[in-house]
């Protein structure tokens, strides 16, 4: 029997009344000059306009940004100040790597459950194009010392100690701080450990692009994606530019492995690309939504987060978090209408799919007597996944939530699982319900 109830003390559910995102654009394309904070303001402003809600009714904004910009460390507060909300609106930022906007949504939901707010906005935005480029440790130390000198001679002595190498810019780190391993290296390890072939990975990537292309062509995605006019406002973007509308399985086989050149199977094509974009959802106390006459997309029925070791299988978070959320809600895998899993890499997604069905893995790692269950692939990532749409780190969770709720509504309702892996061995899982 499930023990988790996402309800207020009066028994009201937490409703999601709106979801919106920018188009997702590959690094250094349409959003090449747009920082994450502006992507966040862009999508929240449009959401407020579309819902026609008085911005001053928003009581809390929880937003995230994985690649932090030093000049705007609290993206949530900048969004409040830049979108016409009440200046007294509470706003704070969170980060849970690729599961950031799931965390943001949970935080707002918990505020509603506690009765401290009735309406809130959650989401995330990231730019892989506008990045904080750092300096070497030696240059940083010398610049600090330089600021404390008083004479020209002292300044010259400090500057003379610097080499050309010390002056080189330092890009943001792509590896785990604790292990030095990149996500791609972990995906390679998971492919080898769990027997995920190159052909299987390429097939999933092709499936993702094919289904995403079909969803766009059938008009299923347009309603949740705004048209953006990035500076200098001469062009606009209204669709994701990573989706391959001409995807062929043969095309994937041409690419060389990206992380293990000799024996690897993870390529740029069967992985998510670096992406720019923002996404948000609006949550309300169920009664408040009805009082305001808002259409309810659906409800959060349950959620769970997980944390595992980072040395091996670091991206197995969906399996661990899903086991927890199903236990929390008293559901079985067979109860689900849809399953949407973040595709950081085809290898990672397929390894998780495999472990969902493994009794041995469940007994040794999940504290379960039997497997979570074998995933019915007719329910899995039915509109394509992150490999096709792209992955602005903090925005992906909100994209998945909105996309899933709208698809459930098209199908006449049901229950769905959203789940994602995240850096640091973290995982997230959320159960959504549409009546």
Swiss-Prot record:
Catalytic activity: an acyl-CoA + acetyl-CoA = a 3-oxoacyl-CoA + CoA
Main location: cytoplasm
InterPro entries attached to this UniProt entry: Ac-CoA_C-AcTrfase_FadI, Thiolase, Thiolase-like, Thiolase_C, Thiolase_CS, Thiolase_N
The enzyme's E.C. designation: 2.3.1.16
Keyword Cell wall biogenesis/degradation attributed: no
SUPFAM superfamilies from the UniProt entry: Thiolase-like
Compartments, as annotated in UniProt: Cytoplasm
GO molecular function, one term: acetyl-CoA C-acyltransferase activity
Annotated family: Belongs to the thiolase-like superfamily. Thiolase family.
Job of this protein: Catalyzes the final step of fatty acid oxidation in which acetyl-CoA is released and the CoA ester of a fatty acid two carbons shorter is formed.
Protein's recorded name: 3-ketoacyl-CoA thiolase
Organism: Vibrio parahaemolyticus serotype O3:K6 (strain RIMD 2210633)
Lineage of origin: Bacteria, Pseudomonadati, Pseudomonadota, Gammaproteobacteria, Vibrionales
